């Protein structure tokens, strides 16, 4: 599954990348461009814009209207619709910044590229494979918060119903 996210859902793109989905985020694209790219690249268009959603569906593009105000609510609705297990898969995670694949590297590969205390305190490091990005990741203090949000979203997902909601209105 590949996603295309409009400008109103930028944070959602980061979450989807973290859990391993090929996610393109275009924050300044006009509606017609989003629809065209979603169609050409066979991506599911995610939006919170009802008008964009309806235009995409009318043009035969697979689209989903995201509900929710918080990250965990948005993730829960998306996970319910596409039967996504909201957990980090370290083998498939992508760079939350650019969307490229990340790779587990030996600790020595990041020496002098991360703060000394980080190098001393952590054993596992991942590097973005995009030559222009090359961000380095590790299980820092944010790791607990990431898992808390994903767990909360999974719990909410199990109590949701999509019946009769506008995202299922394909007319």
Report each predicted region and the residues it spans.
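Short metal-coordination and nucleic-acid-contact micro-motifs, chiefly zinc-binding Cys/His arrays
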Residues: 88-92, 121-124
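Short cysteine-rich clusters marking metal-coordination/redox-active sites
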Residues: 95-98, 128-130
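Short functional micro-motifs and their immediate structural scaffolds
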Residues: 100-104, 133-138
